[in-house]
């Protein structure tokens, strides 16, 4: 059984752009997301560039976010996170409604303070074996009391 993404992200619909975690450890993650008709980041039947970036950011943040929650928590802690920098992003293609994308991310570096974490990540989004997008981004995540 895969862990619930709700444990590791503060996002909820309609801004939740990850459905399932298929693999996670301390330094890498693989997620999936089915693009549905009610997705707010669609344009003419295609998932937008912004949607791909948000999907990759949410996938990345779950790696670090897992350490802010205990095993029994179902997203009740108040954790905030945001992209602090996108060093490089390339969009090669856009997926369509009903397609399921797979997103893979790897932690490159991480700095932890008492109240927050800053991390650098590499990520890529795919439809089947077709590369849709890549990015390297920095994320800032902290518990919001």
PLM segments and residue spans:
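Short Pro/Gly-enriched beta-strand edge/turn motifs at strand-loop
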Residues: 1-5, 103-105
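Short boundary/loop segments of OB/S1/cold-shock single-stranded nucleic-acid-binding domains
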Residues: 5-9, 94
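Catalytic strand-loop segment that frames the active site of acyl-thioester-processing enzymes
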Residues: 12-48
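Ordered, amphipathic secondary-structure segments that act as subunit-interaction surfaces
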Residues: 16, 58-69
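Compact, glycine-rich, soluble single-domain proteins
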Residues: 45-63, 84
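HotDog/MaoC-like acyl-thioester-processing domains
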Residues: 62, 96-145
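Hydrophobic beta-strand-centered segment that forms part of the acyl-chain substrate-binding groove
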Residues: 64-104
């Amino acid at each position: 059984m895969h862990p619930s993404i709700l444990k590791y992200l503060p996002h909820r619909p309609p801004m939740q752009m990850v459905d399932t975690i298929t693999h996670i450890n301390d330094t890498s993650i693989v997620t999936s997301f089915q693009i549905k008709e009610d997705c707010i980041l669609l344009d003419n039947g295609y998932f937008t560039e912004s949607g791909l970036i948000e999907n990759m950011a949410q996938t990345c943040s779950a790696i670090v976010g897992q350490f802010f929650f205990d095993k029994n928590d179902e997203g009740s802690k108040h954790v905030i996170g945001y992209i602090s920098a996108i060093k490089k992003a390339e969009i090669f293609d856009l997926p369509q409604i009903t397609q399921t994308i797979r997103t893979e991310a790897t932690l490159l570096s991480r700095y932890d303070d008492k109240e927050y974490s800053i991390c650098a990540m590499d990520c890529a989004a795919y439809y089947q074996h077709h590369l849709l997008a890549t990015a390297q981004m920095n994320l800032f995540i902290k518990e919001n009391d």
